[in-house]
């Protein structure tokens, strides 16, 4: 086992990364090894997808499968070995199919089929035991003694960034947003990473390409969500429970939320969002369901307590899932799509009747809590609508600075930095937030500036796209570069989606971003210095010191 993809990973003087019997996230060594082997097989599929494309062969089913299966290897997504094995077996079948199609096309064109790299040649074992015996060939640091640590760090930066992009591709696909050109470039990068390059310059350039690719993917996802559910609107949301039977929907998948809402109409069940599903409450399409009553709980790391206290059924539509046995709710939590936990019921297809039956059988909430309201819904359209007023308030001096504070949440104590930062921002500043990092301060009162709320909840982590659009619009109005705006970006990272959002911002030339609370363990000191020198990327320090720098206070 070697896994170093999330903030929780082990850090010791002897080296970083989880490499024993179990990772800090709870992932067993066998699961980690199977996921590495799955990635290896997917890279082999991409090798043939690239070669097949050169001869005009495009398989949309395979284009969708590879990022979806890759998504299953993100932090806190799938802990079920049997599901990972099944993905690997399917990858082997798809690779064989593409290989046959490619070789036939070569024969018809009078060409000799090209030799493929080792990553596309493995004969996958037929059982879990056999696959585990093959896992060493796919270990991410298998050649660590033969290469410079910076090369390994760059490979991992690319791999983990591409994982984040794969997740957004799958979220977009669910909403019928696909792009053959994007899929083709995705395969090219997967195939390149499968070759274990030692070219640092090419790896760094690839990391930037992944950021650019993800910008297109986030635009696709934005289109999918707004075309399916309308543009988010500023919306007041209750964060307390309501009397009645209950279903809690966590993750990121709004299509699943829509299906659950449709199937619970007239059933006497209240539906709540959780975590990154909170922004759904601002979409017009969901407002026609009066039984979507609000948001329950907070960010992913608190789920074992929050789900244990929730007297209904829980659906995990995507990351992040953690051990449901700790809170003794494994019999009433359901996984969906790429999510998996051993022994937990998995919903296949679009029938959520098992979830509904479980909710009806459970007690539900016995009384209404005193409501606590927050305002959400400041995504792209709402931000653009507010732009003229924002510009006027900047010009008259009422708004002097913007802060984008968001990203992933986590359970480390030093994440209180983000709470204190938000509370310490000047009264003449605007705070934009997104991702589950918002839960560090989104229930606090920040007031407004001439009717403009000081705290603007932009949405999910992928809605960084909306914040980027606002920054571009403001830069155009003020005829300046984005980096010349009175804008400071402070991103909390935990896993691979945050990595790819960061790569996207860097690839767009955004500078002087702060990340925290700890730097990724796979980034060497040399790589961190390169990123600081090139982009001004730095780690958070103290709220007081960082604010002085961001506000240019001597």
Swiss-Prot record:
The keyword ATP-binding does not apply. Hybrid [4Fe-2O-2S] cluster binds at residues 252, 276, 320, 408, 436, 461, 495, 497. It catalyses: A + NH4(+) + H2O = hydroxylamine + AH2 + H(+). It comes from the Bacteria. It is found in: Cytoplasm. The modification Cysteine persulfide is found at residue 408. Gene3D superfamilies: 1.20.1270.20, 3.40.50.2030. Binds 1 [2Fe-2S] cluster. Keywords: 2Fe-2S, Cytoplasm, Iron, Iron-sulfur, Metal-binding, Oxidoreductase. One of its GO terms (cellular component) is cytoplasm. InterPro entries: HCP/CODH, Hydroxylam_reduct, Prismane-like_a/b-sand, Prismane-like_sf, Prismane_a-bundle. Its cofactor is [2Fe-2S] cluster; hybrid [4Fe-2O-2S] cluster. The keyword Metal-binding applies. Belongs to the HCP family. This is Hydroxylamine reductase. It comes from Shewanella sp. (strain W3-18-1).
């Amino acid at each position: 086992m070697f896994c170093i993809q999330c903030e929780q990973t082990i850090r010791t003087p002897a080296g970083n990364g989880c490499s024993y019997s179990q990772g800090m996230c709870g992932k067993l060594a066998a699961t980690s090894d199977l996921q590495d082997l799955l990635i290896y097989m997917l890279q082999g599929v991409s090798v043939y997808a690239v070669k097949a494309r050169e001869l005009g062969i495009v398989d949309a089913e395979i284009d969708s499968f590879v990022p979806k299966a890759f998504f299953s290897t993100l932090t806190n997504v799938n802990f079920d070995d049997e599901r990972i094995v099944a993905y690997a077996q399917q990858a082997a079948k798809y690779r064989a199919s593409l290989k046959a199609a490619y070789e036939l096309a070569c024969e018809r064109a009078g060409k000799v089929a090209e030799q493929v790299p080792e990553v596309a040649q493995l004969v996958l074992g037929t059982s879990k035991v056999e696959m585990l015996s093959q896992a060493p060939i796919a270990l991410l640091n298998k050649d660590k003694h033969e290469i410079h640590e910076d090369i390994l760090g760059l490979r991992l930066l690319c791999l983990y960034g591409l994982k984040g992009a794969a997740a957004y591709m799958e979220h977009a696909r669910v909403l019928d947003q696909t792009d053959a050109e994007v899929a083709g470039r995705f395969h090219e990068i997967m195939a390149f990473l499968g070759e274990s390059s030692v070219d640092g310059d090419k790896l760094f350039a690839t990391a930037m390409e992944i950021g650019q690719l993800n910008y297109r993917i986030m635009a696709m996802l934005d289109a999918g969500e707004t075309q399916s559910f309308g543009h988010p609107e500023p919306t007041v949301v209750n964060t307390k429970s309501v009397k009645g039977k209950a279903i809690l929907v966590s993750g990121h998948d709004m299509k699943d939320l829509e299906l659950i809402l449709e199937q619970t109409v007239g059933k006497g069940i209240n539906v709540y969002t959780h975590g990154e599903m909170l922004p759904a409450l601002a979409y017009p399409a969901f407002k026609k369901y009066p039984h979507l009553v609000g948001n329950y709980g907070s960010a992913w790391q608190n789920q074992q307590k929050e789900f244990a206290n929730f007297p209904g059924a829980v659906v995990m539509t995507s990351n992040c899932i953690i051990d449901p046995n700790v809170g003794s709710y494994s019999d009433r939590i359901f996984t969906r799509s790429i999510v998996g936990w051993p022994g937990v019921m998995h919903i296949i297809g679009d029938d959520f009747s098992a979830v509904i039956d479980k909710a009806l059988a459970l007690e539900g909430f016995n009384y209404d809590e005193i409501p606590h309201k927050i305002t959400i819904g400041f995504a792209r359209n709402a931000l653009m609508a507010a732009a003229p007023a924002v510009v006027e308030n900047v010009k008259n001096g009422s708004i002097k600075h913007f802060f984008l504070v968001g990203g992933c949440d986590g359970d480390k104590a030093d994440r209180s930095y983000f709470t204190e930062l938000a509370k310490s921002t000047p009264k003449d500043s605007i705070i934009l937030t997104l991702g589950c990092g918002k839960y560090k301060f989104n229930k606090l009162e920040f007031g407004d500036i001439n009717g403009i709320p000081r705290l603007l909840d932009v949405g999910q982590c992928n809605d960084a796209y909306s914040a980027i659009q606002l920054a571009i619009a403001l830069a155009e109005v003020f005829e300046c570069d984005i980096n010349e705006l009175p804008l400071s970006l402070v991103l909390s990272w935990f896993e691979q989606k945050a990595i790819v959002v960061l790569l996207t911002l860097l690839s767009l030339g955004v500078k002087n971003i702060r990340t925290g609370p700890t730097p990724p363990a796979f980034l060497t000191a040399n790589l961190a210095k390169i990123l600081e020198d090139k982009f001004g990327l730095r780690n958070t320090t103290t709220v007081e010191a960082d604010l002085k720098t961001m506000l240019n206070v001597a």
